[in-house]
Curated annotation (Swiss-Prot):
CDD domains: RNase_A_canonical. It comes from Camelus bactrianus. It catalyses: an [RNA] containing cytidine + H2O = an [RNA]-3'-cytidine-3'-phosphate + a 5'-hydroxy-ribonucleotide-3'-[RNA]; an [RNA] containing uridine + H2O = an [RNA]-3'-uridine-3'-phosphate + a 5'-hydroxy-ribonucleotide-3'-[RNA]. Monomer. Interacts with and forms tight 1:1 complexes with RNH1. Dimerization of two such complexes may occur. Interaction with RNH1 inhibits this protein. This is Ribonuclease pancreatic. Endonuclease that catalyzes the cleavage of RNA on the 3' side of pyrimidine nucleotides. Acts on single-stranded and double-stranded RNA.
């Protein structure tokens, strides 16, 4: 079965797309990355940077996660991300999303050895 690091990559990494933020992108990607299986995941962020650059955030500034854990890290530079949010009319199995194309710092949780991203916490 999938590791936490693999799940992070499936749910959040889209390195090679520059994603012009159209809702089609979110609708396709949420489906393709299996976040509409059994329910519609309400919010999800895709990161359009190299995996190497995102993994490097694990050695950048330590911050407290939303849940109070202390293994979150904030990127020193802004990153190109797409926020996908469920629309009001979205209803499983016809999950519908709108896209926001953003340039923000990401906050991710890291764990393990090697110390790698396992959870997307926020963007600021």
């Amino acid at each position: 079965s999938e590791t936490a690091a693999e799940k992070f990559e499936r749910q959040h990494m889209d390195s090679y797309s520059s994603s012009s933020s159209n809702s089609n992108y979110c609708n396709q990607m949420m489906k393709r990355r299996e976040m509409t299986d059994g329910w519609c995941k309400p919010v999800n962020t895709f990161i359009h940077e190299s995996l190497e650059d995102v993994q490097a955030v694990c050695s950048q500034k330590s911050v407290t996660c939303k849940n109070g854990q202390t293994n979150c890290h904030q990127s020193s530079t802004t990153m190109h991300i797409t926020d996908c949010r469920e629309t009001g009319s979205s209803k499983y199995p016809n999950c519908a999303y709108k896209a926001s194309n953003l340039q923000k710092h990401i906050i991710i949780a890291c764990e393990g050895n090697p110390y790698v991203p396992v959870h997307f916490d926020a963007s600021v």
